[in-house]
């Protein structure tokens, strides 16, 4: 008997739940061996839409390497969910920071506003250089790390780097990875109070939509209020129709106040890019005078920040550096998930309802085109065809009974899996690979098979030759119903 290997999830101890959403939950966890604290994000992947989101977020986090962006530490499958382990920000988020300032009745100092804003510009400049649109920039998605690599955060009321936390942009769940030739997106995404004019009007948009959101965050830092607030419908209508998008900001920093008009400009073409923001003299002077040493505390250099950052990402197919290849073993999961998405698209066109007990169009076509061959098939192969066509003989009846028993045994947990895949054979494959298929629930055959594929990834071909032979190609993986394994 093959001993079941420990799950990657066993390495982490859940301390508390941080949040929840329509696609999954987030937890504060501790690595059992090192004691290091992480953020665990568990995402459901039980349909193709969720797979698309996980695939996109996975690609993005894999290539992200910036001190102002949350880092990916690990990723794996757990009970039908895809799990991302990220660094944990111990000081909450910018939303909580703003709320604390409101309660205290004290506005942020000019130094704090400039420092926070410049950190966000530097972070967005990097993100946009990777052809990524975040699409949900807001205080809740900006987390606060310590004010020093080895110390806690200060009170946040002074004019020194010692009191300034390191900001990190988080949550790439609705982010978009653009190609170098297609720079426009058109999917509605974001939070109403921070969403751009073009998205409100359902127009195609570029990464300039993030600049609008950045402008809203800057407005909030300067005034402790939002340029638009209220119910979703009211906010969207105001952004769509108002000629003056926000009230003048009564703030001593006139340069920042003027910059707001370049960020919250309804015309994306006239809206500043991150590079244009960095080119502003007062921004550049602040960064050079106050932020170089700040970043050195985190072993990060911003030399060359005023130049266009070269793209690390080859969008024709993620071109990872040697270090990334060595350190990010989980990158194979994203390749596998891309294959999963493609297979599911092909498979779902022939997907049939189990209760209908009908043969798929693909099989009917195969039967018509290969009738003579089918007549000569062995009894095991005939079994599945006869099952669908209700033509039974003694041998086929025995095999049909076996298949019916397998379906009944797994009906509770996998009631959406149809007869195109022999569940019993996949279960034997899973046992040989050291996990229990009954612990997983999937809506389609393609997803069930891809679970087995993911477990087989990297295994020795000689040792697991039967598994590889069974899952050798898409056709056999989706249509093989032979009981012999």
From Swiss-Prot:
The active site is at residue 136. Residues 366-419 have a biased composition (Low complexity). Keywords: ATP-binding, Kinase, Nucleotide-binding, Serine/threonine-protein kinase, Transferase. Signal peptide: none annotated. Residues 354-365 have a biased composition (Polar residues). Residues 12-283 form the Protein kinase domain. It is an enzyme of class 2 (transferase). Gene3D superfamilies: Phosphorylase Kinase, domain 1, Transferase(Phosphotransferase) domain 1. Residues 354-419 are annotated as: Disordered. PROSITE patterns: PROTEIN_KINASE_DOM, PROTEIN_KINASE_ST. The keyword Ribosomal protein does not apply. One of its GO terms (molecular function) is ATP binding. Belongs to the protein kinase superfamily. NEK Ser/Thr protein kinase family. NIMA subfamily. PANTHER family: CAMK FAMILY PROTEIN KINASE (PTHR44899), NIMA-RELATED KINASE 11 (PTHR44899:SF8). This is Probable serine/threonine-protein kinase nek1. It comes from Dictyostelium discoideum (Social amoeba).
